[in-house]
Structure formats: C-alpha cells, structure tokens
Amino acid sequence: MQAQAPVVVVTQPGVGPGPAPQNSNWQTGMCDCFSDCGVCLCGTFCFPCLGCQVAADMNECCLCGTSVAMRTLYRTRYGIPGSICDDYMATFCCPHCTLCQIKRDINRRRAMRTF
C-alpha cells in the first residue's frame, strides 16, 4: 500500500473582484484636493461621514475607512505599490488627505468601471 503524497496549497482561495492589476497607481496624489473639491470639503468638514462612505464603498463596517488597515486593503486590492509602513505614516501624518485620496480613487475607478 502506497502512501498518498500530501497536497500543498500554494495560493489561498479568496473572495473579491479577482486578481489585482500588477502595475496600478493611485489615480490622484495625496494632496490633489482640487481635483475633486466635493471630496475635499467633505473630508475637511465631515471627516466621519467620508470615512463611512469609504467603508460602505468597500463593503466594510462603518468608520474603518479611516484606518491603516483599510488603506492597506485598498492598496493591495488594486496592486498599488507601497508597504504597510507607508500606509501607517501617511495615515498618521495626514488622515484627512489619505482618506480623501482613497475616496477620489474609488470615484475614478468607478467611472472607469474598474471598482
């Protein structure tokens, strides 16, 4: 009787829109607020509201849109280069700018039908 070779799982199955593009970038820079003034104003005067919008856009719980984890999830989902350390520093130094950047990116990807 021969022993059966063990099955090794190389990639874990996931849930989501499929594989991320390999060479993607942010659609706008962190300080490009004038490219979408509505998002900028919402982020400045109603930061929690914008956080909830981002969380809802990504099918996550309310207010986690402002977190490092959400930025890292978004960045990895769309193949945007960077690291969790970069995400932490950006979110720590300018949470309003990073949240606005994610929302602008979501809006642009929606317009291109890639979100």
Swiss-Prot record:
Instruction: Give the matching InterPro entries.
Output: PLAC_motif_containing
> Which NCBIfam families does the record match to this protein?
A_thal_Cys_rich (TIGR01571)
A GO biological process held by the record: defense response to bacterium
A single GO molecular-function term is: chromatin binding
Q: What is this protein called?
A: Placenta-specific gene 8 protein
Gene symbol here is PLAC8
Spell out the family assignment given in the record's similarity comment. Belongs to the cornifelin family.
List each coiled-coil range.
none
Q: Which domain of life is it from?
A: Eukaryota
